[in-house]
């Protein structure tokens, strides 16, 4: 094959790959410095439960995600956007956790065999039946602005009673190291309060964690 032609093909493939990484945010390899897919996504999925356990014990002093779920009747059907390794997903047979990462879903199924999980995209997921609640825990700070709006709109279309968002406080002051592993965080911090202006905001941990609730 002509060397110039080969170089052009390599350049086109590289450009296409780089373009996808830049704009198809769930597959951005810079998220948490490891990404959520492939080999490094598998490593990320393995260490995530340990990080959650450490944070609950040493930063919050309680099980953060379960403290949100226990605010609601256990019989409620809950759709969990961006479920990760499953700690934020309700434990009953009418609730479901979805995530774009196969690695995260596989790990969630190992840890919580009695919960329901499947691959799904928070912007595009559709269901014949609505859920009582839609939760979104620690997802939106990993999402570009336009896509955050799409996720919120989709959540509203799928929920019967409430939308519950648990995430980094809008007045949080991140370290440079954290910003390096959270490519959309600064935009999130600057805009999330305006984007959720119709939600009731509850301070879970001052300057650290906020809960936003929308009653439908």
Residue spans for each PLM region:
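Hydrophobic adenine-recognition pocket in adenosine-nucleotide-binding enzymes
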Residues: 139
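A conserved beta-strand element that flanks and buttresses the S-adenosyl-L-methionine
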Residues: 135
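Short glycine-dipeptide loop
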Residues: 159-163
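Conserved alpha-helix/loop element of class I SAM-dependent methyltransferases that forms part
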Residues: 58-74
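C-terminal alpha-helical "lid/dimerization" subdomain adjacent to the S-adenosyl-L-methionine
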Residues: 164-212
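Class I SAM-dependent methyltransferase SAM/SAH-binding core
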Residues: 79, 84-124
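N-terminal, positively charged/glycine-rich alpha-helical extensions of SAM-dependent methyltransferases
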Residues: 5-50
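A short, conserved alpha-helix within the catalytic core of class I
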Residues: 143-154
């Amino acid at each position: 094959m002509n060397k110039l032609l080969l170089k052009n093909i390599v350049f086109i493939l590289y450009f296409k790959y780089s373009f996808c990484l830049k704009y198809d945010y769930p597959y951005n390899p810079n998220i948490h410095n490891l990404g959520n897919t492939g080999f490094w996504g598998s490593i990320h999925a393995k260490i995530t439960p340990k990080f959650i356990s450490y944070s609950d014990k040493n930063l919050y002093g309680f099980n953060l995600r379960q403290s949100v779920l226990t605010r609601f009747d256990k019989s409620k059907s809950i759709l969990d956007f961006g479920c990760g390794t499953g700690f934020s997903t309700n434990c009953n047979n009418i609730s479901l956790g979805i995530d774009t990462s196969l690695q995260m879903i596989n790990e969630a199924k190992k840890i919580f065999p009695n919960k329901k999980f499947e691959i799904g995209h928070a912007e595009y997921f559709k269901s014949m039946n609505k859920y009582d609640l839609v939760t979104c825990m620690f997802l939106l700070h990993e999402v570009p602005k336009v896509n955050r709006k799409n996720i919120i709109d989709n959540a509203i279309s799928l929920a019967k009673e409430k939308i519950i968002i648990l995430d980094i406080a809008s007045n949080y002051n991140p370290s440079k190291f954290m910003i390096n592993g959270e490519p959309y965080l600064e935009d999130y911090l600057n805009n999330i309060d305006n984007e959720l202006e119709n939600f009731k905001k509850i301070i879970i941990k001052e300057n650290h964690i906020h809960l936003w609730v929308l009653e439908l």
